[in-house]
Amino acid sequence: MSTRREVILSWLREKRQTWRLCYLLGEAGSGKTWLAQQLQKDKHRRVITLSLVVSWQGKAAWIVTDDNAAEQGCRDSAWTRDEMAGQLLHALHRTDSRCPLIIIENAHLNHRRILDDLQRAISLIPDGQFLLIGRPDRKVERDFKKQGIELVSTGRLTEHELKASILEGQNIDQ
């Protein structure tokens, strides 16, 4: 029998051609990062990961990593108070501009600013897919849902519910 992570990964792979924006949410240790890593490995394509980090001083900074840099264990320095689209543009100049998968980690932090920047970021990569990863938060989920971002939970759905929705081809909505 498949594990919960494998079932969710199967759903994401199956639906990959249909979603443009997806919010993968779950508590710490629920497998969100593992799922994102598996999607990166699927096609061995370039992936850009943006991680929003909030320091103890309350300042937000983006850390931008492409797939090669992540494999080497190095990270670019963070820029404080810069917009997501600007960091994405910087990353695109360093990597393949046809990057198909953009992962935005910690999307629950400062989510309204992410939503503001997302349209500009999408215009930079018109054929890309954006996978937002974060913790469950009703306000964040509601705001993302209003923007048409598909929600996928790693923790609240039972394996049976997820398998049933895969078999029926239904959209998972929480």
What spans do the regions from the language model cover?
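Phosphate-binding P-loop
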Residues: R13-W19
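N-terminal pre-P-loop "Q-motif" helix
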Residues: M1-L12
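Conserved P-loop NTPase "ATPase switch" module shared by AAA+ and STAND
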Residues: A91-I114
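Conserved catalytic segments around the Walker B and adjacent sensor/switch elements
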Residues: K41-W56, A61-W62
